Regions:
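Bacterial Sec-dependent N-terminal signal peptides
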Residues: 1-22
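Generic structural detector for well-ordered beta-strands
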Residues: 43, 54, 93, 103-107, ...
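The feature marks short-to-medium sequence segments in extracytoplasmic or secretory-pathway proteins
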Residues: 56-95
């Protein structure tokens, strides 16, 4: 009986942990500064926000994500912590295909966040994506 009760408690705990993770696939966004990077998905949980990126650039050339990159939500900045498949401020050399995938890790966003901006900063050539929708709503366009 104790084993069954212990198993039920573990399953309930795992379900609770899993429920706190939110995944937004191919989020809509309002504007971007470059077509060289695209967000494939964003995973939000209580320990981190992980942004999955596909980069497109000329083969055997490089792109770089600045170490001061951040997400901004409701006026607050969440600076990049690390990366998977990339390191902030280090060149990412593009393979022959011209496509490279990586992840950027940021602090957790508040649970009620509906939109977020990504930017490297305000300098020439910086990557920025504004109005990334975490709520499943379509992008806003003044042209629509």
């Amino acid at each position: 009986m104790k084993q069954i009760l212990s198993l039920l408690i573990v399953l309930l705990y795992c379900t609770t942990i899993q429920a706190k993770e939110r995944v937004v696939e191919l989020p809509a966004f309002d504007a971007w500064s470059s077509t060289s990077i695209e967000i494939q998905k964003i995973v939000l949980n209580d320990t981190a926000t992980t942004v999955y990126i596909d980069a497109f650039y000329r083969p055997h050339n490089w792109i770089k994500i600045a170490k001061d990159s951040y997400l901004q939500a409701d006026g607050k900045q969440y600076k990049i912590l690390s990366g998977i498949g990339m390191e902030p401020d280090k060149e990412i050399w593009m393979p022959e295909s011209g496509t490279y995938s990586f992840q950027m890790i940021f602090p957790p966003l508040p649970e009620n966040t509906t939109t977020v901006d990504f930017t490297e900063g305000d300098f020439e050539g910086s990557f920025s994506i504004w109005g990334i929708h975490l709520d499943g709503k379509p992008a806003f366009s003044p042209l629509a």
